[in-house]
C-alpha cells in the first residue's frame, strides 16, 4: 500500500494498492469510491487534432490524444514501450510510481504512470471517474514529474525542467515556462543589480524587482518562440536529488509558485542551486514576483495558501520553515516579504509535504521523522520585523550546515589584511553560527511511525481536525488541541 495524497479540500485520498492499481477513498464518510487498473486500461480511439473537445468525449466516451512537441508514435515505438517495462530497474520507476492529481471532489483526475515504461511516463490521462472513461490523453516530449490543477488551470512539470500551463476548461495550452532560460535571464538580472551598486542604475529595490520581473517575462516568452543558445544542457530531474518544485493555489486566482535556479557564483560558474522562487499568475499568464534566496540550501518543499497570498518553504535540511507574502496583494511591500519563521527542529529531516489550512491559520509539516508538526500562523510572537527580510538572507541554524558546503563565504586568506574588514568577517561568522532561539516551535504535533510515509490533509468542513494517511494502510482523524500539545486521535480506519 502506498498513500499518494489528499485532494485540494481533503475530501478524498488517493492510494496505490499495487504498482498498477489506484483507489480513491472518501474521507467522510470513509469508504472507497473509485478504482482503476492502469495496466489493463486502454484508450479506444485517437485523434491528433491538437485540442481536446469535452463534449465529444462525453457523448462518445472516446479518448483524444494531444501531442506537445512530439510526433505521433509508431508501432515500433509501441513495441519499444513494452520493452521498457522489462528494462526499468532503477529505484525511481521499478515500483510503479504514479503522478496523480484530483480536481477537488469532482469526477476528473489526471494520471501519469511512470512505472509502465519510459514512454508511458510521458503520457498524461484525464479520466472521468463516474463514466470510467478517458476524456483525453496528452503526450509530452519528456517524462512527467508533477501535475497540479484547480478549476481554472492545469500545470505540468517535466523532467526537462519545463512547465506547461493549460486552460482546464478546454485543455488548451497557454504557456510553456522553461526554467533553464529563466536561469539565464536571472544572470542578466543580476548584472542590473551589480550595475546599481556602481551607480549605473538607481539602487531602489522596487525598481530592481521590476527589472527582474520584466526579464522573467521576456525569457518566458522566448521559451515559447524558440530556444536560447545560452541554455545549458538539461538535467534529468526525475533522478536528481535537486529538482524543481511547484504548487498552485486552489482559488480561481490560480497563483503558481515554482522554484528557480539561482545565478552561478563567481567561483563556481557551473553551479546549480534552487534557492529562489518565482510567483506566476497563470490566469493572466504573467509573472508576479521573484523571491531571491529564500533559504541557504536548496528549496525542497513548497505550499501555497488557498488564495495564493502566502507561500511556505523549506530547504533540503528541513530545520527551518518560512512563510512569505507572494506579492499578489496591491499593498505588498518587497522589503517585508518574509512573514513568519518557524523552527521544526535541530535534526536534519527530508520534508516532503507542507500544507496550509483553508483559513490560513495553520501549517502542517510532514517529513521522514516520527513527528508531524502543526504551526500556528496567527501567533504574534513569531512575527518578524520588516528589515530582517530586506536582503533575502536571515540568520538561521542552516547557515552552520550550509557554510560547510558553500565556500562562497570565503576564508580569512581571501580577505585583505585590514583590521576593520577582518573584524567584520569574524563577527558575521560567529553570528551565523549561533542558532536563532527566538523562532517559534510547533503549536501541536502528531506522533507517527517513522518507517511509514504519511501525508496530511486539512478538511475544509472540519477546521479543528486534521487527516493523516500512512503507507501502512491506516487513515486517522485527529482533533487539534485548543492549547499547545499533542493532537488527540478520534477515529481510525483502514484502506482495504
From Swiss-Prot:
A motif (L/FRRG motif) lies at residues 342-346. The keyword Phosphoprotein applies. Residues 75-84 have a biased composition (Acidic residues). GO terms for biological process: autophagy; protein transport. The modification Phosphothreonine is found at residue 213. It is found in: Cytoplasm; Vacuole membrane. This is Autophagy-related protein 21. It comes from Saccharomyces cerevisiae (strain YJM789) (Baker's yeast).
Amino acid at each position: 500500500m502506498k498513500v499518494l495524497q489528499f485532494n485540494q479540500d481533503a475530501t478524498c485520498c488517493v492510494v496505490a494498492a499495487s504498482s498498477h492499481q489506484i483507489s480513491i477513498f472518501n474521507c467522510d464518510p470513509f469508504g472507497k469510491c473509485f478504482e482503476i487498473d492502469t495496466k489493463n486500461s486502454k484508450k479506444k480511439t485517437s485523434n491528433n487534432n491538437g485540442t481536446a473537445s469535452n463534449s465529444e468525449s462525453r457523448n462518445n466516451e472516446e479518448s483524444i490524444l494531444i501531442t506537445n512537441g512530439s510526433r505521433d508514435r509508431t508501432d515500433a515505438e509501441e513495441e519499444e514501450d513494452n520493452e521498457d517495462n522489462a528494462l526499468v530497474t532503477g529505484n525511481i520507476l521499478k515500483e510503479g510510481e504514479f503522478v496523480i492529481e484530483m480536481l477537488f471532489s469532482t469526477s476528473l483526475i489526471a494520471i501519469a504512470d511512470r512505472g509502465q515504461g519510459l514512454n508511458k511516463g510521458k503520457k498524461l490521462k484525464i479520466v472521468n471517474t463516474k463514466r470510467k472513461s478517458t476524456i483525453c490523453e496528452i503526450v509530452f516530449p519528456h517524462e512527467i514529474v508533477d501535475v497540479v490543477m484547480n478549476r481554472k488551470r492545469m500545470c505540468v512539470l517535466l523532467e526537462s525542467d519545463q512547465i506547461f500551463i493549460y486552460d482546464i476548461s478546454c485543455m488548451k495550452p497557454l504557456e510553456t515556462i522553461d526554467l533553464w532560460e529563466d536561469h539565464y535571464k536571472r544572470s542578466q538580472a543580476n548584472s542590473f543589480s551589480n550595475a546599481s551598486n556602481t551607480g549605473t542604475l538607481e539602487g531602489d529595490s522596487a525598481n530592481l524587482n521590476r527589472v527582474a520581473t520584466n526579464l522573467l517575462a521576456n525569457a518566458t516568452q522566448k521559451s515559447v518562440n524558440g530556444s536560447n543558445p545560452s541554455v545549458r544542457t538539461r538535467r534529468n530531474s526525475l533522478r536528481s536529488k535537486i529538482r524543481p518544485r511547484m504548487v498552485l493555489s486552489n482559488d480561481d486566482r490560480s497563483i503558481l509558485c515554482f522554484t528557480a535556479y539561482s545565478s552561478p557564483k563567481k567561483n563556481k560558474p557551473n553551479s546549480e542551486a534552487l534557492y529562489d522562487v518565482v510567483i506566476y499568475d497563470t490566469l493572466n499568464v504573467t509573472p508576479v514576483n521573484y523571491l531571491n534566496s529564500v533559504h541557504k540550501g536548496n528549496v525542497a518543499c513548497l505550499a501555497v495558501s488557498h488564495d495564493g497570498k502566502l507561500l511556505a518553504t523549506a530547504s533540503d535540511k528541513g530545520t527551518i520553515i518560512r512563510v512569505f507574502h507572494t506579492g499578489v496583494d496591491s499593498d505588498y511591500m518587497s522589503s517585508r516579504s518574509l512573514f513568519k519563521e518557524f523552527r521544526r527542529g535541530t535534526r536534519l529531516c527530508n520534508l516532503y509535504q507542507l500544507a496550509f489550512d483553508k483559513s490560513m491559520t495553520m501549517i502542517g509539516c510532514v517529513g521522514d521523522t516520527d513527528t508531524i508538526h502543526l504551526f500556528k500562523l496567527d501567533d504574534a510572537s513569531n512575527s518578524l520585523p520588516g528589515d530582517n527580510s530586506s536582503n533575502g538572507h536571515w540568520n538561521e541554524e542552516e547557515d552552520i550546515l550550509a557554510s560547510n558546503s558553500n565556500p562562497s563565504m570565503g576564508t580569512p586568506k581571501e580577505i585583505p589584511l585590514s583590521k576593520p574588514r577582518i573584524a567584520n568577517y569574524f563577527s558575521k561568522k560567529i553570528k551565523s553560527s549561533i542558532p536563532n532561539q527566538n523562532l517559534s516551535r510547533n503549536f501541536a504535533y502528531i506522533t507517527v511511525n517513522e518507517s511509514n510515509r504519511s501525508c496530511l490533509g486539512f478538511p475544509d468542513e472540519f477546521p479543528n481536525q486534521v487527516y493523516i494517511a500512512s503507507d501502512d494502510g491506516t487513515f486517522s482523524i485527529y482533533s487539534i488541541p485548543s492549547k499547545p500539545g499533542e493532537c488527540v486521535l478520534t477515529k481510525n480506519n483502514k484502506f482495504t
